[in-house]
């Protein structure tokens, strides 16, 4: 069972390195940031609200998301 929950304030995930796309540019814009938790889970937050809620995914969930994105499952 995870010690993290969805909607946890990102400020409670102290000491993490948050990553975002290099394509986001210097102003940040509407970017998603991710961080890898010591438990192996992956946290995601909105760069415009870095202290706001974070979504937490298991590694298999994250891998499935990346696979779907790479396969075009989310394309319009």
Regions found by a protein language model. Give the residues of each.
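Generic secondary-structure boundary/loop-capping signal
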Residues: 15-16, 34, 71
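A short, structured beta-strand/loop element
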Residues: 21-60
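Short helix-coil boundary/hinge micro-motifs
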Residues: 2-15, 19, 75
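C-terminal structural segments of small proteins and small subunits
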Residues: 55-76
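Residue-level signal for pocket-adjacent positions within structured domains
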Residues: 13, 50-52, 69
């Amino acid at each position: 069972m995870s010690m993290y929950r969805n909607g946890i304030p990102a400020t409670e995930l102290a000491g993490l390195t948050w990553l975002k796309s290099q394509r986001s540019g210097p102003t940040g814009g509407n970017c998603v940031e991710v961080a890898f938790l010591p438990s192996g889970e992956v946290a995601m937050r909105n760069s415009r609200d870095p202290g706001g809620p974070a979504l937490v995914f298991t590694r298999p969930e994250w891998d499935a998301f990346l696979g779907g994105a790479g396969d075009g499952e989310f394309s319009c």
